Curated annotation (Swiss-Prot):
Organism: Oryza sativa subsp. japonica
Alphabetized PANTHER family for the sequence: UDP-ARABINOPYRANOSE MUTASE 3, UDP-ARABINOSE MUTASE
Function: UDP-L-arabinose mutase involved in the biosynthesis of cell wall non-cellulosic polysaccharides. Catalyzes the interconvertion of UDP-L-arabinopyranose (UDP-Arap) and UDP-L-arabinofuranose (UDP-Araf). Preferentially catalyzes the formation of UDP-Arap from UDP-Araf. At thermodynamic equilibrium in vitro the ratio of the pyranose form over the furanose form is 90:10. Is probably active as heteromer in vivo.
One function term, GO molecular function aspect: intramolecular transferase activity
EC number: 5.4.99.30
Motif DXD motif boundaries: 108-110
Protein name, per record: UDP-arabinopyranose mutase 3
Site positions (Required for activity): R156, R163
Record's keyword annotation contains Lyase: no
Catalyses which reaction(s): UDP-beta-L-arabinofuranose = UDP-beta-L-arabinopyranose
GO BP of this protein: cell wall organization; plant-type cell wall organization or biogenesis; UDP-L-arabinose metabolic process
Amino acid sequence: MASSDAAAAQAATPLLKDELDIVIPTIRNLDFLEMWRPFFQPYHLIIVQDGDPKKTIRVPEGFDYELYNRDDINRILGPRASCISFKDSACRCFGYMVSKKKYIYTIDDDCFVAKDPSGKDINALEQHIKNLLNPSTPFFFNTLYDPYRDGADFVRGYPFSLREGAPTAVSHGLWLNIPDYDAPTQLVKPLERNSRYVDAVMTIPKGTLFPMCGMNLAFDRDLIGPAMYFGLMGDGQPIGRYDDMWAGWCTKVITDHLGLGVKTGLPYIWHSKASNPFVNLKKEYNGIFWQEELIPFFQSASLPKEADTVQKCYLELAKQVRAKLGKVDGYFNKLADSMVTWIEAWDQLNPPKGAVATANGTAKSK
């Protein structure tokens, strides 16, 4: 009996509870955490408050968290705080920067616990962790999808030399209920709902881009963290709602170059409410046209062999953004500058081993 109790206790131990931070951008009280309490309470939360820093954000009791507002961001980063968006959920990437954990899970505050087809609550975090801890298959598509899941395997004809897979850098989760639409689609399909639950996880093939959504996303911070910059969006910028997609395009180019994998599929969350399509259209208007230039840019982007770290890859991408997308609109020159500033800020707060960080400055070796 004692051994079965011990086994039950071991099974209930949260996976990676000391190695994972949950990052939540918000402008409101976080009552939604009550629904997530059984799954999130053992973890450390990093809350990034957008908007008015004088506003008080209420967090339910019993959660271990840090909360950063705009004043904190300015204090910690100094002049480099200019790279962190204001009045846009892109501010969440500040949480990635200040975290000291190996893994990050980020979720929006309008996302609730979904149920699987049997009616059981879905532990989204547990599935993301499984996705990240198992390899990806970016170099050859497996028709049974993720061969490392229980009940699946490599199919006949899958090269034996590729069956070890590649390290998984990103786990991109999905959603039920309110779709993740652009504003024009939102306007013509106001009653559409995502109701189809697909029990699958797959690796996005090398050379294929995808529209990354930040509302239910996990990643290995050690492998890809510096590439998870959600751009310069929102207040004072000519574009919004492209923050997660920008990060996804940059990340995919870099993971392809470094031989890392990106998974999409399970887990699902319940997206509870639609944002205003007219407000969204104003934010997205330029992006709707610009993306016709952005997609070919990322599809043809190539990184040199010398770019052997995420930071080097990202700085090279920033150069290419300036050289090629700067012709599309002057905003992209500003964005390229912010990409460089982001890497400087990342290295400021995350100095290489053997170096110490100086306040609002570069790292100096001991």
